Regions:
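Outer membrane beta-barrel
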Residues: 69-278, 321, 353-382, 387-392, ...
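Outer-membrane beta-barrel pore domains
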Residues: 107, 144-146, 157-161, 172, ...
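N-terminal periplasmic/intermembrane-space "pro-region" immediately following the signal or transit peptide
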Residues: 2-89, 96-101, 220-225, 441
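Acidic-residue sensor for enzyme active/binding pockets
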Residues: 6, 14, 28-30, 135, ...
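A periodicity- and composition-biased signal for non-globular, repetitive helical segments
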Residues: 15-18, 29, 122-125, 199, ...
């Protein structure tokens, strides 16, 4: 028994010695690695140059530069979440560039590469049931020269979301009118929005709105069934510090999603929407803030800056159906613009009604990678006899990494009714090719 005990003890001692030797070897290896790292750091320091006098002449010597500590960023306030993001869109535009938008003849655009959007944004949430967004665009016109770009605010708003069915949003953002206008720039299927959308929708405005989803609390599984928006805005565009008069723009939208679920095993949904707008505007107000509406003498279009005061009302309806790889989107918009007398000054333009529509179809040829797009659009500006513009579009979208990295190409053919009826003013059909690279971060 004693011999066995001595044997066990010796075996344990030998095992302990082996473990110590192994650990010692590991420590020696770590020390060697640390020495090598230190040597490499000394061998490749960061230097600045400095001119010094050595008693005879001035010479340039290298002076070691201490490494800076890593950058540390922390929010000043008590936000629960703070997110920095942005995106870049670069266009190549050739042929009759932007002819679909009425840019031909006296408003023609030359072939170009274009920094379409370069935006950076900051979003956040507070524990007190507020969220916010601040976004600016480095690719906007600076208002001094249309050929230059400068930084300009796009979205600056705060939203109180204590009650999902009744939220309050204040600041500058897109007024709730028009499906295509409200669809983010980074996810629409065509490179540019349609002419009817640009001509009629109010785009970004400064104001306040009440909005919400009434079924969020009582029917959570169907919270998207109904969404409503009701807003009051200055009505004279974004980044303007004054209202054009003592009147306001009133905008409302209803969205209904009666179906969201699989059809024959394919992801599917149906969304319906309707909008309404009413506004009284002063002379000089641009009523086509994101597109062209005014018909020029040669049938081309330009932004509509009111020559005198007006009263206008607009409405639209839209639908979006998705079935597996296929999407079908359509929208119809209409606006009535009537001159009004203010302080004894009679209107200097004739009343008119403008309307238009677009229908867009999209299909993934390769799921989530390659998408084919077609679109038919029409705008009747309603200011001259037979002044409508038609366009048909065909395109491809290649999703390198979803919408984060995307390539797009569109071919657009446009017809001008006005120029067809008045051939002396120039050609009535136009062709253009648009390309886009998009990066989101």
């Amino acid at each position: 028994m004693q011999a066995a005990s001595e044997s066990d003890r010796l075996e344990r001692l030998e095992h302990a010695v082996e473990q110590l030797q192994k650990r010692n070897a590991e420590l020696e290896a770590e020390v060697r690695d640390l020495k090598q790292e230190k040597t490499a750091a000394v061998a490749d320091p960061k230097f600045n140059t400095k001119i010094i006098h050595d008693g005879k002449t001035y010479v340039e010597k290298a002076v070691s530069q201490p490494e800076k500590p890593p950058l540390f960023v922390q929010q000043r306030g008590s936000e629960l979440k703070l997110v920095l993001g942005g995106f870049i869109q670069v266009n190549a535009e050739g042929g009759d560039a932007f002819a679909f938008n009425g840019n031909f003849g006296q408003t023609a655009i030359k072939d170009r590469f274009r920094l379409r959007r370069a935006r950076i944004n900051l979003t956040g949430d507070f524990a007190e049931q507020f969220d916010f967004k601040m976004e600016g665009d480095f690719a906007n016109s600076d208002g001094l020269n249309n050929n230059r770009l400068a930084f300009e605010a796009t979205d600056i708003w705060a939203n109180w979301h204590q009650f999902p069915a009744a939220q309050i949003k204040v600041g500058q953002y897109k007024a709730p009118f028009g499906l295509e206008q409200l669809t983010p720039d980074t996810v629409i299927y065509t490179i540019e929005r349609s002419l009817p959308t640009g001509a009629i929708t109010p785009e970004r405005q400064i104001g306040v709105e009440l909005w919400g989803q009434p079924f969020t609390a009582i029917w959570p599984d169907q919270k998207d069934l109904l969404t409503y928006y009701a807003g009051i805005f200055n009505g004279n565009g974004r980044n303007v510090s004054v209202n054009d008069n003592n009147e306001f723009m009133y905008v409302g939208r209803l969205e209904l999603q009666p179906f969201n679920g699989p059809i024959f095993g394919q992801k599917s949904f149906l969304k319906l929407g309707a909008d309404a707008l009413w506004s009284r505007d002063a002379s000089g107000t641009n009523i086509s803030t994101s597109g062209n509406l005014l018909v020029n003498a040669d049938g081309s279009l330009s932004p509509f800056n009111l020559p005198s005061a007006d009263e206008r009302a607009a409405w639209s309806v839209d639908a979006w159906f998705e079935f597996g790889r296929f999407d079908l989107i359509g929208e119809y918009l209409q606006e009535h613009v009537e001159g009004r007398t203010v302080n004894g000054v009679a209107p200097t333009f004739s009343n008119f009604m403008t309307d238009g529509f677009y229908v867009t179809g999209a299909y993934y040829l390769i799921p989530q990678k390659l998408q084919a797009v077609v679109q038919w659009q029409y705008l009747n500006p309603g200011q001259k006899g037979n002044d409508g513009l038609y366009s048909i579009l065909g395109g491809l979208n290649y999703y390198i990494r979803g919408n984060d990295l995307k390539l797009m190409v569109n071919y657009i053919h446009t017809w001008s009714d006005f120029r067809n009826a008045n051939p002396d003013v120039g050609q009535d059909q136009f062709d253009e090719v648009l390309g886009r690279f998009q990066l989101m971060f």
